[in-house]
Design a protein with these regions (language model features):
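Phosphate-recognition beta-domain surfaces
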Residues: 1-116
């Protein structure tokens, strides 16, 4: 799961969101629900990657990438560690889904809508 304060979509580019985070309510390794920290690196703003032919993609190394038409292929993947930290003692590429590449049955992305 992810929580962002910016709208997803548009041309191919990275977007920085200083308040974003990934979180896990349930996972294959039975770690209790937690929020995954965003590693802030000077000069790198890689919270979210947008591309017209991609699904939601988070982190500079595509830490969590949901492919286009994700329920019909195994191109979605997780590779934590570039922007978002895996919990101590957990393998970065399998923590969220139990395997590096996966076919999601459901995807939820949340963002905050504010009224001016």
């Amino acid at each position: 799961f992810c929580f962002v304060f910016r709208h997803l979509g548009g041309s191919a580019r990275y977007i920085d969101d200083p308040d974003d985070f990934l979180f896990s309510l349930a996972n294959k390794v039975n770690v209790k629900p937690l929020k995954l920290a965003h590693r802030r690196i000077a000069g790198r703003s890689h919270s979210i990657y947008t591309h017209y032919n991609y699904g939601p993609t988070f982190g500079g190394g595509h830490d969590l990438h949901i492919s286009n038409h994700a329920n019909s292929n195994s191109h979605s993947h997780t590779h934590l560690g570039h922007t978002y930290k895996a919990p101590p003692g957990q393998q970065a590429n399998i923590f969220l889904a139990g395997t590096h590449h996966f076919v999601p049955s459901e995807v939820e992305a949340f963002y905050l809508v504010t009224k001016n």
